[in-house]
From Swiss-Prot:
InterPro entries xref list: Glyco_trans_29, GT29-like_sf
UniProt lineage: Eukaryota, Metazoa, Chordata, Craniata, Vertebrata
Catalytic activity: an alpha-Neu5Ac-(2->3)-beta-D-Gal-(1->3)-D-GlcNAc derivative + CMP-N-acetyl-beta-neuraminate = an alpha-Neu5Ac-(2->3)-beta-D-Gal-(1->3)-[alpha-Neu5Ac-(2->6)]-D-GlcNAc derivative + CMP + H(+); a ganglioside GM1b + CMP-N-acetyl-beta-neuraminate = a ganglioside GD1alpha + CMP + H(+); a ganglioside GM1b (d18:1(4E)) + CMP-N-acetyl-beta-neuraminate = a ganglioside GD1alpha (d18:1(4E)) + CMP + H(+); a globoside MSGG + CMP-N-acetyl-beta-neuraminate = a globoside DSGG + CMP + H(+)
Protein name, per record: Alpha-N-acetylgalactosaminide alpha-2,6-sialyltransferase 3
Family that this chain belongs to: Belongs to the glycosyltransferase 29 family.
GO MF annotation terms: alpha-N-acetylgalactosaminide alpha-2,6-sialyltransferase activity; alpha-N-acetylneuraminyl-2,3-beta-galactosyl-1,3-N-acetyl-galactosaminide 6-alpha-sialyltransferase activity; sialyltransferase activity
Pathway this chain belongs to: Protein modification; protein glycosylation; Glycolipid biosynthesis
Membrane disposition: Single-pass type II membrane protein
Tissue: In adults it is highly expressed in spleen, followed by kidney and lesser in lung. Not found in liver and skeletal muscle. In newborns it is abundantly expressed in brain and kidney.
Parts of the chain that traverse the membrane: 9-29
Name of the encoding gene: St6galnac3
Keywords: Disulfide bond, Glycoprotein, Glycosyltransferase, Golgi apparatus, Lipid metabolism, Membrane, Sialic acid, Signal-anchor, Transferase, Transmembrane, Transmembrane helix
Function noted in UniProt: Transfers the sialyl group (N-acetyl-alpha-neuraminyl or NeuAc) from CMP-NeuAc to the GalNAc residue on the NeuAc-alpha-2,3-Gal-beta-1,3-GalNAc sequence of glycoproteins and glycolipids forming an alpha-2,6-linkage. Produces branched type disialyl structures by transfer of a sialyl group onto a GalNAc residue inside the backbone core chains. ST6GalNAcIII prefers glycolipids to glycoproteins, predominantly catalyzing the biosynthesis of ganglioside GD1alpha from GM1b.
Principal place of residence: Golgi
Length: 305
């Protein structure tokens, strides 16, 4: 009897320790916790990620308007994973890590099918250039039916996004929401586009139009993500010095297609007299923002001093 009584405190302490361990694992990782429950014979336990209960009320972003409802975007994320389209993602095998983020952001028509091991399979927000909308419409079921929970944010100049019937891209989007009523498609307002141009001028001292350049989809992604996310982890984006570093890794411009070399494309755009993206200049700005916001870059790693 005395032996049993001595064991009870030890059992109680062990049980409490186990509960604390499970709670800690739940806080640290909402994804692998259900797998641990399976080990205890509860595979059918209904699981609600703790991060769902901790989320802040949705924040309204008035610079982005729903094509169907004409309502502004409501979005608020905790930890965001922003996945680059770069060939740097090939072979990284960080798909599971990416999918553990509260919100996964992708750009343009970058696919997940066939690349899940490297880039994950979930997408919550997809920021898309007006020039990439026709690429989405080549496979509309994949982007707007299978991925109906994804929020699409389309950016483009007023001439293509105008709502008076003369905006060629806006007309495409209107037809898309008619065909796919569950699709969540938002367009960037003219005022927000002007704001993004202003940020570029403030950060670089250069007028975007006068310098003959176009902002990249990455630029628009960062502008929105910094408003919507508490912290940001960027995967597969190179910094401004990468292409001049001896022995740098040569990769395709996109992870999902062979062809253009990433660094060649960056240098071509950076020095184009007209119509180019200032990718390298933008990366300098991103590094500056990382000093002020909770932003980290990996695969490859950035040193932000």
């Amino acid at each position: 009897m005395a032996c049993i009584l001595k064991r009870k405190p030890a059992l109680a302490v062990s049980f409490i320790a186990l509960c604390i361990l499970l709670l800690a694992m739940r806080l640290a990782n909402d994804v692998t916790f259900p797998l641990l429950l399976n080990c205890f014979g509860q595979p059918k336990t209904k699981w609600i990620p703790l991060s769902y209960t901790l989320r802040q009320p949705l924040q309204t972003h008035y610079g982005y308007i729903n094509v169907r409802t004409q309502e502004p975007l409501q979005l608020n994320c905790n930890h965001c994973a922003v996945v680059s389209n770069s060939g740097q993602m090939v072979g990284q095998k960080v798909g599971e890590e990416i999918d553990r983020a509260s919100c996964i952001w992708r750009m343009n028509n970058a696919p997940t099918k066939g690349f899940e091991e490297d880039v994950g399979y979930m997408t919550m927000v997809r920021v898309v250039s007006h020039t990439s909308v026709p690429l989405l419409l080549k496979n509309p079921d994949y982007f707007f039916k299978e991925a109906s929970t994804t929020i699409y944010v389309i950016w483009g100049p007023f001439r293509n996004m105008r709502k008076d019937g003369n905006g060629i891209v806006y007309n495409m989007l209107k037809k898309t929401v008619d065909a796919y009523p569950d699709a969540q498609i938002y367009v960037t307002t003219e005022q927000r586009m002007t704001y993004c141009d202003g940020v570029f001028k403030d950060e670089t001292g250069k007028d975007r139009v006068q310098s003959g350049s176009y902002l990249s989809t990455g630029w628009f992604t960062f502008i929105l993500a910094m408003d919507a996310c508490y912290s940001i982890h960027v995967y597969g984006m190179i910094n401004e010095t990468y292409c001049t570093t001896e022995g740098y890794r040569k990769v395709p411009y996109h992870y999902y297609e062979q062809g253009k070399d990433e660094c060649n494309e960056y240098l071509l755009h950076e020095h184009a007299p007209y119509g180019g993206h200032r990718f390298i200049t933008e990366k300098k700005v991103f590094a500056k923002w990382a000093k002020k916001h909770r932003i980290v870059f990996t695969h490859p790693n950035w040193t932000v001093s």
